Amino acid sequence: MRLSVFIANTVSTQLVIDLQKIYASYFPEASLTEQALTELITQSSSRLYMTMFNERHIGAVNVQINATQATLSQLTIRDLTRRRGVGKNLLKQLEKSLTAEGMTDIEYNLKEVAEVELLATQAFLSDSGYQLNNHIATKKLL
């Protein structure tokens, strides 16, 4: 089965369980409750893009749109599935979707990334075509 990418806009028990696993090392425990994750999924100011494999959600990124710029946050892939192209596929599909909507720029503030993850995240984003400058990763969409 292939990877799929979609915007999570409907809360399900499985989605909440999977988000708790995806964000276990990212959010404090208080942010992993069903209520907190439901708010993350349903907030109107942003979209939660998910990647799925074999009926399990294995990665997520939050996206805020402002005119022609998209701002990424909370990008993470479940530990067990890292380094297998899941994150690259998520970004590729996300960028394709945003380009179709008329977005021209993407940025990600790396100050939110845990220090132990920073070098790997910088390398991942650089390898995905992002320019790094003072904790901000940017990419022009074509």
Predicted regions: what is each one?
Residues 27-52:
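Active-site rim helix/loop that mediates acceptor-substrate recognition in acyltransferases
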Residues 98-113:
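Conserved GNAT acetyl-CoA-binding A-motif
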Residues 18-22, 36, 89, 93, ...:
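Alpha-helical elements of Rossmann-like donor-binding domains used by nucleotide-donor carbohydrate transfer enzymes
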Residues 50, 56-64, 69-76:
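Conserved beta-strand in the GNAT
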Residues 109-116, 122, 126-142:
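Conserved catalytic-core motifs of GNAT/GCN5-like acyltransferases
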Residues 77, 83-96, 123:
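Conserved acetyl-CoA-binding loop-helix of GNAT-fold acetyltransferases
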